[in-house]
From Swiss-Prot:
Family (UniProt): Belongs to the SFTPD family.
Bias-annotated ranges (Low complexity): 165-191
Domain Collagen-like, first and last residues per copy: 46-216
Protein name stated in the entry: Pulmonary surfactant-associated protein D
Species whose genome carries this gene: Bos taurus
Length: 369
């Protein structure tokens, strides 16, 4: 009962402005909990009293249900890198990626072992002549040559001194006695008597001056021969190089024979005419070496070529253009067979074997010089 008069007293002592605010706050608080100030009986017509002091904190309630998650915050700054972990197990192989660009070429490897020698390639065209090489060193002095021919006799030596006089000859015959006369002057000498006996040989005269020796002429001749031999050797070397150049690439040399082709194909008669106009003839191989040279030319052109032999004079008997019988042959098996009855000429295959052939067909032209 005392609370109500005290509350009224407090209200009367407050200013009116603050009283309105107090009333609003009070009404809000009393609405939240009407039993905070007055617990015993309902209010009467009097004004509510001031708020009492807050009571002690009640017991903690049960944990409520978790609220709905809030929106994700922005990612923070990356933290420092942690220590390197242990190597994990290898993962399964992924699908092959696209082919990368070709890398730069690597350094050249060590040269491999030499391969087997391949077949001879087709000869290239003749290159330009090379420049003459430097003059070679003087060769060693040659040995003593054979003795030269005897020189011509030297001029006669000087005339020797006159030898000693010979012995007096025998007295001549007495003249006919003259008439006795006065003693006149001495008469002329009588006729000369016959020659006396040959006197002894006089002493040898002095040795004449030495004549010119024939050895000088021999030495001069040897020197000229040596010069000619050197010139001949240089000429032979130059000719050998020239011959090799002329034969490259479509020629071969065997001994004193030269085989050359320009690659054209003609009938037997036309081929004969071409070779004759060039100063040669169709080839007549007389040995395995000559046949091998022709084989190389046929192989380089990959064509069969005509040879000079034929059996037009006597069927089955092949002879050279000179009429001589063959001294060498290299027929293919079961050849010559005169197939068709008109195979009177001979061709050489790129493998070197021979075959009788119709003369009117065209084959590679090779000329022999």
């Amino acid at each position: 009962m005392l609370l109500l008069p005290l509350s009224v007293l407090l209200l009367l002592t407050q200013p009116w402005r603050s009283l309105g605010a107090e009333m609003k706050i009070y009404s809000q608080k009393t609405m939240a909990n009407a039993c905070t100030l007055v617990m015993c009986s309902p209010p009467e017509d009097g004004l509510p009293g001031r708020d009492g002091r807050d009571g002690r904190e009640g017991p903690r309630g049960e944990k409520g249900d978790p609220g709905s998650p809030g929106p994700a915050g922005r990612a923070g700054m990356p933290g420092p890198a942690g220590p390197i972990g242990l190597k994990g197990d290898n993962g399964s192989a992924g699908e092959p990626g696209p082919k990368g660009d070709t890398g730069p070429p690597g350094p050249p490897g060590m040269p491999g072992p030499a391969g087997r020698e391949g077949p001879s390639g087709k000869q290239g065209s003749m290159g330009p002549p090379g420049t003459p090489g430097p003059k070679g060193d003087t060769g060693p002095k040659g040995g003593v040559g054979a003795p030269g021919i005897q020189g011509s006799p030297g001029p006669a030596g000087l005339k020797g001194e006159r030898g000693a006089p010979g012995e007096p000859g025998a007295p001549g015959r007495a003249g006919a006695p003259g008439p006795a006369g006065a003693i006149g002057p001495q008469g002329p000498s009588g006729a000369r008597g016959p020659p006396g006996l040959k006197g002894d040989r006089g002493t040898p005269g002095e040795r004449g001056a030495k004549g010119e020796s024939g050895l000088a002429e021999v030495n001069a001749l040897r020197q000229r021969v040596g010069i000619l031999e050197g010139q001949l050797q240089r000429l032979q070397n130059a000719f050998s190089q020239y011959k090799k150049a002329m034969l490259f690439p479509n020629g071969r040399s065997v001994g004193e024979k030269i085989f050359k082709t320009e690659g054209s194909e003609k009938t037997f008669q036309d081929a004969q005419q071409i070779c004759t106009q060039a100063g040669g003839q169709l080839p007549s191989p007389r040995s395995a070496a000559e046949n091998e040279a022709l084989t190389q030319l046929a192989t380089a052109q990959n064509k069969a070529a005509f040879l000079s032999m034929s059996d037009t004079r006597k069927e089955g008997t092949f002879i050279y253009p000179t009429g001589e019988p063959l001294v060498y042959s290299n027929w293919a098996p079961q050849e010559p067979n005169n197939d068709g009855g008109s195979e009177n000429c001979v061709e050489i295959f790129p493998n070197g074997k021979w075959n009788d052939k119709v003369c009117g067909e065209q084959r590679l032209v090779i000329c022999e010089f």
